[in-house]
A protein has these predicted regions:
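Membrane-interface loop-to-helix entry segments
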Residues: 84-132, 143-145, 184-188, 306-317, ...
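Juxtamembrane helix-boundary/capping and inter-helix hinge elements in multi-pass membrane proteins
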Residues: 28-30, 39-46, 171-179, 186, ...
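Hydrophobic alpha-helical transmembrane segments
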Residues: 2-7, 48, 86-91, 116, ...
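Hydrophobic transmembrane alpha-helices that form the core helical bundles
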Residues: 14-93, 97-101, 236-260, 292-312
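A generic transmembrane alpha-helix motif of multi-pass inner-membrane proteins
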Residues: 128, 322-397
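TM-loop-TM module centered on a large, flexible mid-protein loop between adjacent transmembrane helices
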Residues: 35-43, 75-79, 185-248, 266-301
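Helix-loop-helix junctions that connect adjacent transmembrane segments
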Residues: 3, 80-84, 112-232, 236, ...
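Transmembrane helix-loop boundary segments of multi-pass membrane transporters
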Residues: 1-2, 68-85, 105-115, 234-241, ...
Length: 397
């Protein structure tokens, strides 16, 4: 079933990736995917609400990844002490925020090292576990209902969120029209192959109950039967690298995004300020939100929200793409299929989650309402300020 999920999620990600690659090649900008929404729908409330939704979803995902880092670090160094999970999560958020403050070159170098280490070790893990798979554990008899599989695609979409980050790198590329699509397709292709191989290896080694009980350390536990305790430690170190890299990737686009959205009045102007001439206020605010989420919220209870909101946003971007497809040269059929595929997964996810995890749906609604309220509230304040300035600058009679 995990293999089917990976295939389905990879297919949806590939369809959205095609849309993003075409948009990125035509509109290379620091605003990334939110710039694409503006191209299709203008700079009104729709784009503003989408911007705040993106900010919220990315913060949830970044905080959740940081907590995963904390789980592995705590398991390795403190015997799984829950207090240390939070401490390590805070440390990785702070460390990666500093990396992003130092500059894009350090971000790129750090991310390159992390990617090579993680991809290399995960490939080794996949080969070793696949060589010792128990086919009985992968038998279709153990699969859940189709509706649960379709619903889970929205959750496992979390694994592919990195390709959305690629759209924000256009400002740092020498030839974005050529390099961005290539990076998009390579990232999606490599990720899909590795995820499918890992899914087969893990679920062909452990029972579903063992995977669930292992929680965030399931990958390390799956390495033990073949590689022993050394395998557990190897995969734990890999997980530390992977989650550190994902935290870094979550923080990377915030500076450019905040500046671009403040410029178009989607975000308040103070989010574009550079404190001390260097430190992005938007980045600090985002990091603070991530810290609050990591410290004070049960992210396991709302783990699906960040992924589902991201899929919703990506679908809206592809809808926006349909409105400017003549400018990008994208294939209309592929864009329509991308929208329809996501349109099937999202309602199924909402319905299934409403039954099994009503708290997650409540959280989703709260995020939507807050995004609408913040956008309308901020733009009303901006309109009042503009009117006041115009009134004060008008010549007195």
């Amino acid at each position: 079933v995990r293999n089917r999920q990976s295939n389905s999620t990879g297919a949806i990600a590939a369809l959205q990736g095609y849309s993003f690659a075409k948009l990125g090649a035509r509109y290379p900008t620091a605003g990334g995917l939110l710039e694409y929404v503006a191209k299709g729908f203008g700079d009104g409330h729709f784009t503003g609400i989408t911007a705040w939704l993106t900010f919220s979803a990315n913060a949830i995902v970044t905080a959740m990844v940081a907590v995963s880092f904390g789980s592995y670090a705590s398991a390795m160094f403190t015997g799984g002490d829950t207090a240390w999970i939070k401490i390590f999560a805070v440390l990785i958020i702070v460390a990666m925020t500093v990396v992003n403050i130092v500059g894009s070159n350090l971000v790129a170098n750090a991310q390159t090292i992390i990617v090579y280490v993680v991809v290399g070790i995960l490939s080794f893990f996949a080969v070793v576990t696949l060589a010792n798979v128990n086919p009985a554990l992968l038998a279709p008899a153990g699969y859940p209902p189709l509706s649960d599989i379709v619903s889970s695609v929205a959750l496992t979409f979390f694994a592919f969120l990195g390709f959305g980050i690629i759209t924000f790198t256009a400002k740092d590329l020498a030839k974005p029209a050529h390099e961005l699509p290539r990076a998009m397709y390579l990232a999606l292709g490599i990720a899909t192959i590795i995820y499918i191989a890992i899914a087969l290896g893990v679920f062909g080694t452990l029972t579903v109950e063992q995977v669930i009980s292992s929680g965030g350390t399931a990958l390390a536990v799956a390495a033990e039967p073949t590689l022993g305790s050394a395998g557990y430690w190897l995969m734990s170190v890999t997980a530390l690298f992977a989650t550190a890299g994902a935290t870094n990737a979550g923080l990377y686009p915030v500076t450019g995004l905040s500046e671009r959205l403040a410029e178009t009045v989607q975000f308040p102007g103070f989010m574009a300020r550079r404190l001390g001439g260097r430190v992005s206020a938007g980045l600090l605010i985002y990091a603070l939100v991530c810290l609050v989420l990591a410290l004070f919220f049960n992210l396991d209870a709302i783990a699906s929200i960040g992924s589902a909101v991201a899929l919703l946003i990506f679908t809206l971007i592809t809808v926006a793409h349909l409105r400017v497809r003549t400018e990008t040269g994208a294939n209309t059929v592929i864009l329509v299929v991308a929208v329809v595929a996501a349109g099937v997964v999202l309602p199924t996810f909402v319905f299934t989650t409403l039954i099994h995890e009503p708290a997650s749906i409540v959280t989703l609604l709260v995020i939507l309402v807050l995004s609408v309220a913040v956008d309308f509230g901020w733009k009303r304040v901006y309109a009042n300020r503009s009117a006041s300035r115009e009134s004060s600058s008008s010549p007195k009679v």
